[in-house]
Amino acid sequence: MATTKSFLILFFMILATTSSTCATLGEMVTVLSIDGGGIKGIIPAIILEFLEGQLQEVDNNKDARLADYFDVIGGTSTGGLLTAMITTPNENNRPFAAAKDIVPFYFEHGPHIFNYSGSIFGPRYDGKYLLQVLQEKLGETRVHQALTEVAISSFDIKTNKPVIFTKSNLAESPQLDAKMYDICYSTAAAPIYFPPHHFVTHTSNGATYEFNLVDGAVATVGDPALLSLSVATRLAQDDPAFSSIKSLDYKQMLLLSLGTGTNSEFDKTYTAEEAAKWGPLRWMLAIQQMTNAASSYMTDYYISTVFQARHSQNNYLRVQENALTGTTTEMDDASEANMELLVQVGETLLKKPVSKDSPETYEEALKRFAKLLSDRKKLRANKASH
């Protein structure tokens, strides 16, 4: 409940900063937000692969990457992992992973990450392989080296406060310049599934800071879109590149929010009679499912309401499958058969209409977004050259 209240407060703070003034022609803050969901991250990975392919086609550049087009990329849990993969630089200062590399990553490493530890008292998985592969892939890279602004959430169980890792916060909170592999493990350390993560950072003045972190979904309830928007709002206010924006208007904001699928069409429903027989563990699992589904719906509702009120509904796109069934609803079923089903879910989702009231498919909407992202990037490059 407290998390929901904080979301509402943040939402209305963002709303209060907007105005109905016309946007400066061509200037736009672009935001990508990716939900949590374990192995279901395959679904947004399919969407990202399609979008990056469209950007490469529109700009006739096979080396185009998502980080070249988005001012803010935010994620929680598996969405935080995707965020790191597409923003962490390689030795050539380019993203170490293209969008097309993400699904193969899940197929190669998912079965080892979600390999039952055998413990009946501790977490379902020991997390050792996950941490190992993150260290191998992300190396010693820290937040400040990300190729664009990031927003990755976690929750500190010692201070009982959310921890948000962003580049823009480092000047006032240098202790947050953590290694990306520590951040990625922390945001993915879902209670029950993985152990919490402890690490320390050291600032230039010799201070040491301790972190005891769990899944970012504890802080953002699975959907980090509001968090990503708040970071984008701050970026627009503080970054000289956006000096032409006097007061942020939603005509100047482009938000793409990717879900990992829900069963909110009620494949799993319960009656009061059934729930009356549940013990604490059964309630914990059910509450997690219910909370994730409800928060995903409500966050989308909050944001879409604001964009519509500002006559900017075409600047917000939520890509979500709301009718997962069977094994595809499970965040930790990394069997090859289930991962293949998740690929099919993502590919089928592209062909579905964005809403019941619109004939536009997600594929068509993403092509439209790719054109907007390309135009905005070219305009900014032209301004910079003059």
Curated annotation (Swiss-Prot):
Identification of the protein by name: Patatin
Q: Where is this motif: GXSXG?
A: 75-79
Q: Which GO terms describe its biological process?
A: defense response; lipid catabolic process
Where the record places motif DGA/G is: 215-217
EC number(s) on file? 3.1.1.-
The entry's other comment says: Patatin have a dual role as a somatic storage protein and as an enzyme involved in host resistance. This tuber protein represents approximately 40% of the total protein in mature tubers.
Origin species: Solanum tuberosum
Q: Which residues are in the PNPLA domain?
A: 32-229
Concerning its family, UniProt says: Belongs to the patatin family.
Quote the entry's note on domains.
The nitrogen atoms of the two glycine residues in the GGXR motif define the oxyanion hole, and stabilize the oxyanion that forms during the nucleophilic attack by the catalytic serine during substrate cleavage.
Q: Which SUPFAM superfamilies match?
A: FabD/lysophospholipase-like (SSF52151)
Give start-end of the signal peptide: 1-23
UniProt keyword annotations, A-Z: Glycoprotein, Hydrolase, Lipid degradation, Lipid metabolism, Plant defense, Signal, Storage protein, Vacuole
